[in-house]
Amino acid sequence: MATGKIVQVIGAVVDVEFPQDAVPRVYDALEVQNGNEHLVLEVQQQLGGGIVRTIAMGSSDGLRRGLDVKDLEHPIEVPVGKATLGRIMNVLGEPVDMKGEIGEEERWAIHRAAPSYEELSNSQELLETGIKVIDLMCPFAKGGKVGLFGGAGVGKTVNMMELIRNIAIEHSGYSVFAGVGERTREGNDFYHEMTDSNVIDKVSLVYGQMNEPPGNRLRVALTGLTMAEKFRDEGRDVLLFVDNIYRYTLAGTEVSALLGRMPSAVGYQPTLAEEMGVLQERITSTKTGSITSVQAVYVPADDLTDPSPATTFAHLDATVVLSRQIASLGIYPAVDPLDSTSRQLDPLVVGQEHYDTARGVQSILQRYQELKDIIAILGMDELSEEDKLVVARARKIQRFLSQPFFVAEVFTGSPGKYVSLKDTIRGFKGIMEGEYDHLPEQAFYMVGSIDEAVEKAKKL
């Protein structure tokens, strides 16, 4: 095991000099004793002359030139398998929940090759989420990739927690949650939410939060993914939740300049597309098992053309766009039904009835959007009878797209609802065909199925 010495420390980037004949490989892990703590470094570049440039996987406070560094001769390895379920780990797979050792039987390196083309499988099976607007407008495929796009504070994390709760309880599969650069409070809330719903023993939690050095945030997504790959290769259907994929990009940006790379557009790293591709190509389903992934994507300044969200778009099967405008109307989940898309929304996959209902809902909402200007200037009375009907139905649809969440019961004060796809289609089809024209629009706000709206109308 070769030993080197630290020659330079710039924030999270540490240069280490090794003997010429024992230079570590790129992505190898190095270990340094920093006071009474072990610090792991990951090799990023070989600079020549026996010097390697590394990223620290923890705080580099207290490091100084001349400290001895050991080459571990393998990439960072993390525990995988059932021992990780119900545990909270950091980027190195070390437990941070004070429940003792993980006690794993196997450790895998976090840098792995993506499955080959022959191993990939293609499934057209739908995954029901119990959230009306998602099941209707942008259905998820089993083994597909979903992105939750939204600016700050429109509900990405709450939507993700609801999805985990619904899928864990209704589908009873294993899930892996990677918290990448998000708030520690959310991680804490999430853990308690999972414990209260008795699904914690089906979830592995990996966190690299906002206060961590960029090395942690850059690699924690790979740590979570590696654990998910192990479950997949055992022949299971596993769910991988990443909150937030934008922080993964941001961590890369933070160290990119320190690694000596020229920045590209908007100051992002020049390797943005490649780094995203390396991660996304591994999140895939093989003939042995599937990984269905849901990734929250922060959209800087609500601009979907920013290079980071724009690069992520290309890899996804379904995009759920959360809109500040809809959130401001008090409609939660604040999913924009006109902006959200899914490759599964095809009559050959979801069936003709589902497809027609979804497209019908979109056309009514689109027409309402066009009429809004006229209403704002001239008022409702200037509209034709036909347009008045469209507006009335559109407003009912808009309210019916809202839904009380289980994980938000403390905020909304109303119990959460899980709505089956069959009930969702029946409800929206009924509104479009005018079966509920006689009900007031308030009856449709924050209810589950259409039957609840009818019941609510009787009490109004």
UniProtKB/Swiss-Prot annotation:
Q: Which PROSITE patterns match?
A: ATPASE_ALPHA_BETA (PS00152)
Q: Which GO terms describe its molecular function?
A: ATP binding; ATP hydrolysis activity; proton-transporting ATP synthase activity, rotational mechanism
Identify the keywords attached in UniProt to this record, alphabetized: ATP synthesis, ATP-binding, Cell inner membrane, Cell membrane, CF(1), Hydrogen ion transport, Ion transport, Membrane, Nucleotide-binding, Translocase, Transport
Where in or outside the cell it occurs: the entry states: Cell inner membrane
Catalyzed chemical reaction(s):
ATP + H2O + 4 H(+)(in) = ADP + phosphate + 5 H(+)(out)
Pfam annotation, one family: ATP-synt_ab
**CDD domains (alphabetical):** ATP-synt_F1_beta_C (cd18110), ATP-synt_F1_beta_N (cd18115), F1-ATPase_beta_CD (cd01133)
Known InterPro entries for this protein?
Answer: AAA+_ATPase, ATP-synt_VA_C, ATP_synth_F1_bsu, ATPase_a/bsu_AS, ATPase_alpha/beta_chains, ATPase_F1/V1/A1_a/bsu_N, ATPase_F1/V1/A1_a/bsu_N_sf, ATPase_F1/V1/A1_a/bsu_nucl-bd
EC number(s) recorded for this UniProt protein: 7.1.2.2
Gene Ontology CC terms, in alphabetical order: plasma membrane; proton-transporting ATP synthase complex
Q: Which residue ranges traverse the bilayer? A: none
Here the disulfide bonds are none
The main enzyme category here is: translocase
Topological relation to the membrane, as annotated: Peripheral membrane protein
Q: Tell me which residues bind ATP.
A: 150-157
Q: How does it assemble?
A: F-type ATPases have 2 components, CF(1) - the catalytic core - and CF(0) - the membrane proton channel. CF(1) has five subunits: alpha(3), beta(3), gamma(1), delta(1), epsilon(1). CF(0) has three main subunits: a(1), b(2) and c(9-12). The alpha and beta chains form an alternating ring which encloses part of the gamma chain. CF(1) is attached to CF(0) by a central stalk formed by the gamma and epsilon chains, while a peripheral stalk is formed by the delta and b chains.
Annotated family = Belongs to the ATPase alpha/beta chains family.
Q: What does this protein do?
A: Produces ATP from ADP in the presence of a proton gradient across the membrane. The catalytic sites are hosted primarily by the beta subunits.
NCBIfam families named among the record's database cross-references? atpD (TIGR01039)
Instruction: Output this protein's name.
Output: ATP synthase subunit beta
